[in-house]
UniProtKB/Swiss-Prot annotation:
Keyword annotations of the record: Cytoplasm, Initiation factor, Protein biosynthesis
Protein name: Eukaryotic translation initiation factor 3 subunit F
PANTHER family assigned to the protein according to its UniProt record, in alphabetical order: EUKARYOTIC TRANSLATION INITIATION FACTOR 3 SUBUNIT F (PTHR10540:SF6), EUKARYOTIC TRANSLATION INITIATION FACTOR 3 SUBUNIT F-RELATED (PTHR10540)
UniProt entry tagged with the keyword Metal-binding: no
PROSITE patterns: MPN
Record field: compositional bias (Basic and acidic residues): 317-331
Upper lineage: Eukaryota, Fungi, Dikarya, Ascomycota, Pezizomycotina
Subunit structure: Component of the eukaryotic translation initiation factor 3 (eIF-3) complex.
Gene Ontology molecular function: metallopeptidase activity; translation initiation factor activity; translation initiation factor binding
Annotated compartments: Cytoplasm
InterPro entries attached to this UniProt entry: eIF3f (IPR027531), EIF3F/CSN6-like_C (IPR024969), JAMM/MPN+_dom (IPR000555), MPN (IPR037518)
């Protein structure tokens, strides 16, 4: 990943500004949520076969001083690109931006993305569009995120901001200097578990993976902790037996980790663990009960509708039969009267 690269931050002008308006020149740190990357990859998979790259808008949050940006959301923007020109649906971009900001008032426009690592004149045009005043990110710099989607290769991501350093007035609209800035893929424990579950499907032929239950997840987590403890124990034993080279940094890390362990009696730990297991079982039982009730309710509703329709048909049949019987009785009575008169 590109977040391991080294960067040199420069104070940069972002373009001509009116009197009293000062652009932000502080260094940037960009954090990217996994769901934004997944949306970009999904957009790339659904692109037309003759389209080399796709672009879209990045939404997220920005710190008060503008030095920290977190990319949380994104959406695709239609565009056509040839060797001579590029056309972006600006009306669609403005309408979608207004809808997203209405649905998520805490998010703001932070930049745009492209599924290609190439930076060309068209990239500068789009960058200037997102950095402009009014509908752009001014006075903050627009972040340009590139995500490589070459089949068979690792996914590489890079983030840039722009500055018109050395750009003449005639080329100011379609030229800019892209400056790389550090970034990281930020995810929590819940998202990490989801990513591990998704990545486990890559080794299967059907590319699918069943979702584990709470008990299975707990068992897997406990087994993972036991494996790590066994690994640490083997390392310490090898160091004591002079079979492995000691590391002062690793020893200090282990001491700090042990110092964070709470001083709790093993019996209390076992009791709390059993209580947690009982809570998990109760939640699982209640979830299954609710699922069963919903299924039973749907079946009863379907059965009631079916029985109601059958009763209605039966009632109509009885009514028709009664009418036919009455008509037959009247005809028989008429024949008897004519016979008597004769």
């Amino acid at each position: 990943m590109s977040e391991r690269d080294s960067f040199l931050h420069l104070a940069r002008p972002l373009g001509p500004a009116p009197v009293g308006a000062q652009p932000s020149t502080a260094p940037l740190n960009v954090a990217i949520q996994p769901q934004a990357v997944f949306s970009i990859l999904d957009h790339s998979l659904r692109r037309p076969a003759d389209q080399e790259r796709v672009i879209g808008t990045l939404l997220g949050t920005r710190s008060e001083d503008g030095t920290e940006i977190e990319i949380r959301n994104c959406y695709a923007v239609p565009h056509t690109e040839t060797a001579e020109q590029v056309e972006v649906d600006m009306d669609y971009q403005k309408q979608m931006l207004a809808l997203h900001l209405r649905a998520n008032p805490r998010e703001v426009l932070v930049g745009w993305y492209a599924t290609s690592s190439d930076l060309n004149t068209f990239s500068a045009l789009i960058q200037n569009f997102y950095s402009q005043q009014g509908d752009g990110t001014w006075p903050h710099p627009a972040v340009h995120l590139t995500v490589s989607t070459v089949p068979g290769q690792d996914i590489e991501s890079r983030t840039y901001i722009s500055a018109p350093i050395g750009v003449t007035a005639e080329r100011a609209a379609d030229s800019c200097l892209f400056i790389p800035v550090p970034h990281e893929i930020k995810y929590g424990e819940a998202e990490k578990s989801g990513l591990e579950l998704i990545s486990s499907a890559k080794d299967r032929e059907d590319r699918s993976q069943e979702i584990m239950t709470d008990l299975d997840s707990l068992e897997r987590a406990v087994q993972h902790v036991l494996d790590m403890l066994e690994r640490v124990s083997n390392y310490v034993n090898n160091v004591l037996d002079e079979e492995a080279e000691p590391s002062s940094a690793l020893g200090q890390f282990l001491m700090n980790a042990l110092s964070l362990a709470p001083k709790v009696d093993p019996a209390d730990i076992e009791r709390d663990f059993n209580n947690h297991i009982q809570d998990v079982l109760v939640v699982s039982y209640l979830a299954n009960t609710i699922r069963t009730q919903i299924d039973l309710s749907n079946r009863l509703a379907t059965a009631a509708l079916t029985m109601g329709g059958t009763d209605a048909l039966a009632g109509d049949g009885q009514k028709d039969g009664g009418d036919r019987k009455q008509g037959g009785d009247r005809r028989n009575k008429g024949r008897q009267q004519r016979t008597q008169e004769a």
